[in-house]
Amino acid sequence: MFWHLTRILVLLGCLQGVLAIEHDSICTADDICPEPSHTIMRLREKNDKKAHSIAKKHGLEIKGKPFLDGTYYFVVHSSEKRSRRQKREIISKLQEHPDILLIEEQRPRVRRKRDFLYSDAVSEPDNGSINVVRHATSIANAQQRINSIQRDVPVLPFPDPLYKEQWYFNNGAQGGFDMNVQAAWLLGYAGRNVSVSILDDGIQRDHPDLAANYDPLASTDINGHDDDPTPQDDGDNKHGTRCAGEVASVAGNVYCGVGVAFHAKIGGVRMLDGPVSDSVEAASLSLNRHHIDIYSASWGPEDDGRTFDGPGPLAREAFYHGVRVGRDGKGSIFVWASGNGGSRQDSCSADGYTTSVYTLSVSSATIDNRSPWYLEECPSTIATTYSSANMNQPAVVTVDVPHGCTRSHTGTSASAPLAAGIIALALEANQNLTWRDMQHIVLRTANPVPLLNNPGWVINGAGRLFNSKFGYGLMDAGALVKLALIWKTVPEQHICTYEYKLEKPNPRPITGSFQMNFSLEVGGCESGTPVLYLEHVQVLATFRFGKRGDLKLTLFSPRGTSSVLLPPRPQDFNSNGIHKWPFLSVQTWGEDPRGMWTLMVESVSTNRNTGGTFHDWSLLLYGTADPAQPNDPRHPSNLPSSGSIESPFDRITEHIASQEVMVAFTKELNCLCTGAQRSL
């Protein structure tokens, strides 16, 4: 065996390096593939007049707005009737046009909202003026509270009738925990001058609890090719409106509850209410990127335990350009729900949206500070917000369609918008935060203490607690805002790539039940700028196996941190394997990457005749040569000495096993976090 080192100097190289990703949703055989929903055309430069001229000449019609700097949708003109063969002939001719860089048919992909049907069954829409007004008039000094919201610092509690049921704002979780949002509000932050867009099935822009905060510049209808994101009134398109209400429901209007960032501007993209193709996703992710600060998505591929799927080349390009040029170069912030496939033993590592370097992946916890039954585990999760587990537990309060309210929003669908709202508070505090700054401060301020009674907590080689279910802990709005106020932009990011190749050109055969280790020695890219402080770690792996779900991949860092990149998935009987799938871990954040990295490939197969081939793997290290600033409210290295807790600088890779250690650690970390927040 030998290893070969290459260095990637710019992010674009990384983008190009994963263009060969295969997805389970991609098909090429016409007899089994869905009909293309539309075709895209990319010109060498954006030119609306030329695009319409080309389309007209070939009996086509441009739909909607261009995206990605010169890419257009078009369909066969409504007055034309063309056979499949005739459509292909048109595309063939257009491929030879000198002004066209790309012409491609777009086929729909399966995308699912990450909520549950039971939430609709128990939903209690508090529609109205009758109950809501009656409740508001019973509140002492209600008008004084309403008036106070117009000032920088509100007087709590809010008069909104369902505010007291927003337990995740009001110390309502077991042990008196919440997401410390009131602390941010009382500092005067409510999301002013921050724009959030919900990428979903649309939002009801005239909802009385959203209308005052509605942002048309953060909204569009890609499914209907117009500017109105209003969802169809068919009972099945309430998801986006609910998510929008979590972020920016108006406070003090005696209707429903309040949004996390109740002064933020909220928009929506109607893109899930129709065929969802790569170009539909790309257009959504790149909408008005210099105006929109945060894109929130509570959907993804099938959470069925047998699918590998993620963004196509256009959507990956949209992510890349978003972080490079969005928000005037500071980078768009993409917040993503981690997935609801836990009951099917799915892993969010098989979801290419949550495993993107460019997304901030968010998990869920319940009111009793446990992991819900639907939760997926993976090492790309950064942090957690509250949601619910079943119909007997309080869920998330938000707006509903038509013009109503609900107490029953749930799933990781509910967690991502709460995170987006908390991030909006931090952006109001510091508009100069880059997309990487935001990942740093979310990770550093996430609070593990409420969730420590769950198994799986580990201290990484940089001394930080993490859990594959919850990331680095529960998001803490007060701590996030305080750290944002004093945060200095992180040093420039560098990327080093190490490729593992076999001694022989043929893939290595693997059979039955086995365990194999493949190691790479990392030196920190001495030939150029070194990576000495890790952020993201990606593994691009290629293999085939008789039953893909029998494989387990674990990555070990030089500091002893183990990340389960892919757990066994019993439902996954696919025999095609994966090709350069980008597994992502944030669990080694802050570590020094120099030393021996090992990828352990295991099989849980009981069938000796089940085999396959291991082809190659690459290790991509994202990080900096210099450390980010030292402010770290949750870093266990600041803990007082304790005989019951090992040093965070030891290579601790096992679970914190004993309840005595857990209790002691909780008490000490609580003291640390309280003091650290005050000092900020």
Question: Where are the predicted features?
Answer:
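N-terminal signal peptide
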Residues: 2, 11-26
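Surface-exposed aromatic
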Residues: 38, 64-84, 107, 111-113
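Protease zymogen maturation seam
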Residues: 95-194, 208-209, 226, 316, ...
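Subtilisin-like peptidase catalytic core
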Residues: 173, 181-183, 194, 201-206, ...
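Extracellular S/T/G-rich loop segment that most often corresponds to the catalytic His/Ser-adjacent loop
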Residues: 200, 351-428, 432, 468
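Secreted peptidase-domain scaffold signal
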Residues: 339, 466-468, 473-551, 613-680
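An often Trp-containing, charged/polar helix-loop segment at the C-terminal end
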Residues: 430-466
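Short beta-strand-plus-loop segments that form exposed binding edges in beta-rich domains
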Residues: 600-609
